[in-house]
Amino acid sequence: MIRFVLFISCFFLIGTVVECNKDGYLMEGDGCKMGCLTRKASYCVDQCKEVGGKDGYCYAWLSCYCYNMPDSVEIWDSKNNKCGKGK
């Protein structure tokens, strides 16, 4: 019984430390989507992994889209679009 409780405790601890379930477009410092039109094929995959994501691709050769990123990563959102609005 003690082993079962320890197993469950470890399972929940691991789940709370690294939550990687966020998908979306990577965002540049100016609030715009991270472009990939003129980049090499692995650019988006590399950028996604750099922020802790599992995988990514260049969506329609325009913007980097990532899978399974940590919840702490800020992603582009059409509702809060700051692109081109200045800081």
Curated annotation (Swiss-Prot):
InterPro entries listed in its UniProt record? LCN-type_CS_alpha_beta_dom, Scorpion_toxin-like, Scorpion_toxin-like_sf, Scorpion_toxinL, Scorpion_toxinL/defensin
Instruction: Identify its protein family.
Output: Belongs to the long (4 C-C) scorpion toxin superfamily. Sodium channel inhibitor family.
**Record remark on domains:** Has the structural arrangement of an alpha-helix connected to antiparallel beta-sheets by disulfide bonds (CS-alpha/beta).
Q: Where in the cell is it found?
A: Secreted
PROSITE patterns referenced in this protein's UniProt entry, alphabetically: LCN_CSAB (PS51863)
Q: Which body tissues produce this protein? A: Expressed by the venom gland.
Citing just one GO molecular function, the answer is: sodium channel inhibitor activity
Q: What is this protein called?
A: Alpha-toxin To2
**Keyword Disulfide bond in record:** yes
What organism is listed for this UniProt entry?
A: Tityus obscurus
Xref: Gene3D superfamilies: Knottin, scorpion toxin-like (3.30.30.10)
GO CC, alphabetical = extracellular region
Which residues, if any, are the signal sequence? 1-20
Alphabetic keyword roster: Amidation, Disulfide bond, Ion channel impairing toxin, Neurotoxin, Secreted, Signal, Toxin, Voltage-gated sodium channel impairing toxin
State the SUPFAM superfamilies in the record.
Scorpion toxin-like
Keyword Signal assigned:
yes
Positions carrying Lysine amide: K85
**Where do the LCN-type CS-alpha/beta domain residues begin and end?**
22-84
Q: Which SMART domains match?
A: Knot1 (SM00505)
Please name the Pfam families in this protein's record. Toxin_3
Task: Please provide the Gene Ontology terms (biological process) for this protein.
Answer: defense response; envenomation resulting in negative regulation of voltage-gated sodium channel activity in another organism
